[in-house]
Amino acid sequence: MAISGQATLADALARYEQDFTRTDVYFGYENVIVARKGTLVVGCILSFKGTDEDRYAALDSQGGEFPRESDDDEIYIDSLAVDPDHRGGGIAKQLVRAVIEQAAAQGFTKVSLLADVAKPHLGKLYRSLGFVEVKRMRYLNDEYEKLVFDMVQANTSQGYAI
């Protein structure tokens, strides 16, 4: 709830539901890919262009200063979630790959994210997809590793370039 600026979970959910239809917030529908099994939502991933982060940061209802998470030349993965009953089936990897493909289609060569070092399984997941750590940083009192998937580097190591 801290990031939403709302006092209760109900208020936070109402705020996110209202803002989901907007195009001037990073968690709007345009930045979300949803994984479904039939009609059931089993996962989702939220990403945005690094060039858009400052525009979104201006909407912070808490008025606090946050360090930039992204760089202008990349697509940034902000959030990834898979329903607990559907974990272990490759949904998270499919969603991350979808963002990488989308980034390439838009002319980007890098995709980045922050992984909480207190949750090593996250770093392991992203490393298995070719992400590498480029730095560590503190964000909201926690330590994160910034991981980057560089398409040119990944493809060159396989013998071809984009």
For the regions a protein language model found, what residue spans apply to each?
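Conserved GNAT acetyl-CoA-binding A-motif
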Residues: 75, 87, 96, 103-115
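A short helix-loop-beta-strand connector motif used in the catalytic cores of GNAT acetyltransferases and
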Residues: 21-34, 50-55, 76
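C-terminal "cap" of GNAT-fold acetyltransferases
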Residues: 64, 109-123, 127-129, 135-162
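A short, internal acetyl-CoA/4′-phosphopantetheine-binding micro-motif in the GNAT/acyltransferase core
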Residues: 64-65, 80-87, 116
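Conserved acyl-donor/pantetheine-binding loop and adjacent beta-alpha core of acyl/acetyltransferases
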Residues: 48-79
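Conserved beta-strand in the GNAT
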Residues: 34, 40-49, 76, 81
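Conserved GNAT-fold acetyl-CoA-binding loop/helix
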Residues: 1-20, 30-31
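Conserved G/P- and acidic residue-centered "switch" motifs that form tight phosphate/ATP-binding loops
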Residues: 90
